[in-house]
């Protein structure tokens, strides 16, 4: 991406851009790079201050990883979204580690974490923006935790399937049982058993080639109430 194009992007996404000095702007631009990630590639493992990630194309997935290897998907990022939790050095008040993977082939702009951290020390607006951006995602995180702790599996699975078809604009969730289990923080056997029940009730049909097709959206939605 050309320098002038990057400046226009930053003017749009960082409300404090015009308050930065010319030296800070130059440092900010030097610390930025366009990075291409392939599907399944790990972007941030929770140990490094990767930096702030702006999604241009594709889709990223943020999740937690338990000690026994179970993944719990927190939320996904789409074009135009920003990942602030990958800049842990900026968010010193947030102590849990998230992992970021490319769910699809993705093009992103990555702003170096150290450059942003240095700016945030001297420009309160940059620090406030980082915290507000991170906090805006905690409603998504709390929703996931609420589902895991308080909702039955049939309700959770119904919500997941309806959310997926809403995002894709299709009536089919093209995922394997293993993938669904991974995204939901469950076991494949549990998901397979629940999908078998949904199939017997005429809510969905399941095939290895096509995934899970929604047959009765109204009744599936009733399970979420």
Q: What is each stretch, according to the model?
A:
Residues 1-38, 82, 87-90:
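Cyclic nucleotide-binding regulatory module and flanking cytosolic helices
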Residues 30-31, 42-52, 70-72, 95-96:
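A short beta-loop-beta micro-motif enriched in histidine and acidic residues
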Residues 40, 50-63, 78-80:
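Glycine- and acidic-residue-biased ligand/ion/polar-headgroup-sensing regions
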Residues 44, 56, 162-166:
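Short, locally clustered residues in the helix-turn-helix/winged-helix DNA-binding domain
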Residues 63-67, 101-103:
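A generic structural motif
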Residues 75-132:
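Cyclic-nucleotide recognition modules
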Residues 103-104, 121-186:
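Polybasic "coupling" helices that flank or enter modular domains
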Residues 162-225:
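Phosphate-/nucleic-acid-contacting segments
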